[in-house]
Amino acid sequence: MFSFIMKAAILLILVGCISFCISSEPLNESEITFEREERSLADPAGRQKRQSGLSCPKRISHSPEYPRDCYDILQSCSGQSPPSGQYYIQPDGGNLIKVYCDMETDEGGWTVFQRRIDGTINFYRSWSYYQTGFGNLNTEFWLGNDNIHYLTSQGDYELRVELNNTLGNHYYAKYNKFRIGDSFSEYLLVLGAYSGTAGDSLAYHNTMRFSTYDNDNDVYSINCASHSSYGRGAWWYKSCLLSNLNGQYYDYSGAPSIYWSYLPGDNDQIPFAEMKLRNRSI
């Protein structure tokens, strides 16, 4: 009798895991939710159900049962790969937030924190917007410097940058270490070694603080974040740049825009850019 009960319990767990990993749909909401969700102490199970039916056994044990990043979600179903899409996570020390998880590229588990795809979202924004995040997870967004800081402070993280040029050719840049500091450090950038096909246009900005048009932290005589010659947009400027993926969107006019200096082809007319991070445990 005991053996039968154990087998039935295992079967229920496997069915729940397969249901999440194969058939669940990404969350329906289109706008990023950066504000903290109120926790229901009386119904923690109900909160868990809101995470797209997540019922797989978890390797994480911290309260309140939300994964810390997309890598945690990937690891929650042994032998099965959850779909790419929107999920709730809660980084250590941070708020409950909704993110887009890339579960396909380079073995999956990537938490996407920036995307440029169609110019529908204005990226020429103030410090406070970049601090908390803005945009639409279905199109273009910045996840927020506070959120990126909390994510990259949880352990050893890597960065992957995806880029398309005007010919439609795809390139990537990967850094084996990625972290940004807190608001007191003005989100100082820390990078490791480069690999990839896009060229290393970010190492120049290593150890630089984040700048916006209303908070100039570069080492140049002008504010690089507000100057039209550099595409405008917030970034870890130095004096001034070899890259800026938050510049004004590519519009065929030839004006400075999203920029990656060593990208083959049109390095300052980039129609697609995406930045994502992942725990290096993979």
UniProtKB/Swiss-Prot annotation:
Signal peptide: 1-24
Pfam families assigned to the protein according to its UniProt record, in alphabetical order: Fibrinogen_C
UniProt keyword annotations, A-Z: Disulfide bond, Signal
UniProt key word Disulfide bond: yes
SMART domains: FBG
Disulfide bonds: C70-C101, C224-C240
Fibrinogen C-terminal domain: residues covered: 61-281
UniProt xrefs under SUPFAM superfamilies: Fibrinogen C-terminal domain-like
Gene3D superfamilies, per the entry: Gamma Fibrinogen, chain A, domain 1 (3.90.215.10)
A GO cellular-component term linked to this record: extracellular space
PROSITE patterns: FIBRINOGEN_C_1, FIBRINOGEN_C_2
TM region positions: none
Domain of life: Eukaryota
PANTHER family: FI21813P1-RELATED, FIBRINOGEN/TENASCIN/ANGIOPOEITIN
Protein name, as recorded: Fibrinogen-like protein A
Organism expressing this protein natively: Apostichopus parvimensis (Warty sea cucumber)
